[in-house]
Structures are given as C-alpha cells and as structure tokens.
C-alpha cells in the first residue's frame, strides 16, 4: 500500500519542550484538553493508531503518553462508542482545565481554609494526618506568611483583651481546629492556653520564656484542683516581639499542637469527656489578634 510514512514522520512533533499533561508542581495533573490517555481517535477501532501514524506514536505536537486534544480525562472522544457522554463532559465531571478539588491554575490553596499542617505537603513536620483543608488536605499548608481568617465560629480579627476566654459551645470534638493569632510581647515571660471544664483544665499548654534561664513548653492537666504530671517539650518556636499562629487540632484520643504551620507536639487526653470542655482560656504576655475554631 502506498504510504508516505517514514521514520522522520514518526519522530516529528516530539520536540515539544513543555508538553501538556506533564506532572506540574502539584504532582500528576490530569492531561490537558484531550481524550483519555490511550483513547482511540474518532471513528477508529480501539487500539488503532491515528491516521498516518505508527502504533504507539504520540499525537502530532504532543508528548509521548499525552492525551489527544479535544477531551477531558474520563471523557469519551467525539463520535465514540455507544453509551458515551455527550460532548461537554461526564455527569459530575470537573470543568476543563482542572482536576476535581484542584486549585485554579497559578493559585495556592487559600489561607482562609482552616487547615492543620499535614505530612502530605512537602516541607511539613511528620507525625500527623493531613485533613481537608490542613492540621494543612485534608490540608495543604497555608500560603507562606499568611494566616487563616477567622472562621464561621470565630472572632473577627482585631485586638482582643488578654486574658481572653473563647467559648466552645457543645465542647470540643474530633476534627475541631482552634486557631490563635497574636504577637509575643518584648521581654515576655510566658503564655498559656487552657482548655477548661469548670475549674478543671483538660489541657494546659504553657510556653515559658525564662525558666531557670531556659525556654521550655510545659503541658499538664488539672483535675479537682490537683495538677498532674508535667510533660515538657524542649522545642520552642516562639520569639519575643514576633507574631505567631497556634493551631490545636482535637483528635479522638489526643490534642495536636502546631505553631507557625509546623507540628510541635501531641498531648493525650487525660479528661475523656470532651463535650464538657466548654471554654478555651488564653493568657500571658501576648497581644491577641484573633481566636477562632472550625471543623475540618
């Protein structure tokens, strides 16, 4: 059969320096507008090479393995097999150009979505699950230098009087994320977060800037006016005169604490009845900007 096919023809169009569908900064992005990877061309038999091409050859101008132009991953090519979704996408399909749940091109998952720093995001501390939005997807980290805005159950950003009590109606529950924003005062001595049940303290988080000329974080629980055994943490991410973000993620059997988007410590529940923990007390040598909570 007469054919102008040659090896040069088969290799033409493979020099695209920035092929569509190549893994981007967010990992394996879906192929750009085109068909399902490996889909046949319109009217072709499954597995048949495109007209004028060699079996296994990439479409003209494309990168090997790239989906042919015109479709979205999961979408049948025009004129395809019976049962194919009409042009425009499959029911429930994400709009062209994005993967379900993916941020728009050129944007970072917004800092307004409550999130606990998670190990799935490069550069974050290990030891905690990622969550929707999180402790950041279930959480990407918030944009560098940005803090989440106050959530639907929080207090609008602005100076708050310290000591300050944040009501927690219904108590705390797993996947509740509490976010505290503020600035450490110069020559600070201490700050404290106290998750309270009446006069009891379920979780006492107490960074101390100068205890015997050392900086240390002390965690504890107070039941019936008696303090339990202290748990001490040597890592100390707070600096006098500098802003901070504290995030406390409630899990079924422990609290997780992150500071400035990095996981810091975990504290197992000593008080088991979480719904009775109805208030968060914030005190110490800080200027408090906001305190909020949200479910993630």
UniProtKB/Swiss-Prot annotation:
On this chain, the residues bearing N-acetylalanine are 2
Keyword Ribonucleoprotein on this protein?
no
Regions of biased composition (Low complexity) lie at: 12-31, 38-47, 121-133
Repeat (sequence) residue spans along the chain: 36-44, 45-53, 54-62, 63-71, 72-80, 81-89, 90-98, 99-107, 108-115, 116-124, 125-134, 135-143
**Which residues lie within the region annotated 12 X 9 AA tandem repeats of Y-P-G-X(3)-P-G-[GAT]?**
36-143
Q: Which GO terms describe its biological process?
A: cell differentiation; eosinophil chemotaxis; innate immune response; macrophage chemotaxis; monocyte chemotaxis; mRNA processing; negative regulation of endocytosis; negative regulation of extrinsic apoptotic signaling pathway
Annotated GO molecular function terms are: disaccharide binding; IgE binding; laminin binding
Which InterPro entries does its entry note? ConA-like_dom_sf (IPR013320), Galectin-like (IPR044156), Galectin_CRD (IPR001079)
Which segments does the entry list as coiled coil?
none
Post-translational modification here is noted as: The degree of phosphorylation is higher in the cytoplasmic form than in the nuclear form. In protein isolated from a canine kidney cell line, 90% of the phosphate was on Ser-6 and 10% was on Ser-12.
Which named protein is this?
Answer: Galectin-3
């Amino acid at each position: 059969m007469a054919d102008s096919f040659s090896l040069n023809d088969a290799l033409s169009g493979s020099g695209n320096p920035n092929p569509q569908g190549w893994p981007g900064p967010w990992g394996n992005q879906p192929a750009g507008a085109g068909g399902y990877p490996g889909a046949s061309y319109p009217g072709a038999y499954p597995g048949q090479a495109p007209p004028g091409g060699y079996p296994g050859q990439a479409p003209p101008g494309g990168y090997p393995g790239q989906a042919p132009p015109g479709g979205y991953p999961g979408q049948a090519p025009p004129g395809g097999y019976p049962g194919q979704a009409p042009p425009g996408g499959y029911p429930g399909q994400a709009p062209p150009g994005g993967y379900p749940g993916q941020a728009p091109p050129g944007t970072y998952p917004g800092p307004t979505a409550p999130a606990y720093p998670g190990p799935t995001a490069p550069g974050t501390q290990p030891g905690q699950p990622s969550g929707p939005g999180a402790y950041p997807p279930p959480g990407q980290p918030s944009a560098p230098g940005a803090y989440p805005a106050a959530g639907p159950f929080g207090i609008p950003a602005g100076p708050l009087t310290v000591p300050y009590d944040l009501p927690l109606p219904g108590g705390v529950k797993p996947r509740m994320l509490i976010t505290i924003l503020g600035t450490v005062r110069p020559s600070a001595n201490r700050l404290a977060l106290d998750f309270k049940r009446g006069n009891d303290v379920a979780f006492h988080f107490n960074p101390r800037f100068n205890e015997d000329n050392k900086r240390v974080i002390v965690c504890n629980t107070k039941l019936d006016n008696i303090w339990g055994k202290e748990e001490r943490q040597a890592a100390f991410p707070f600096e006098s005169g500098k802003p901070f973000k504290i995030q406390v993620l409630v899990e079924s059997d422990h609290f997780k604490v992150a500071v400035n988007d990095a996981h810091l410590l975990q504290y197992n529940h000593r008080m088991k009845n979480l719904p009775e923990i109805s208030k968060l007390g914030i005190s110490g040598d800080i200027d408090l900007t906001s305190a909020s909570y949200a479910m993630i």
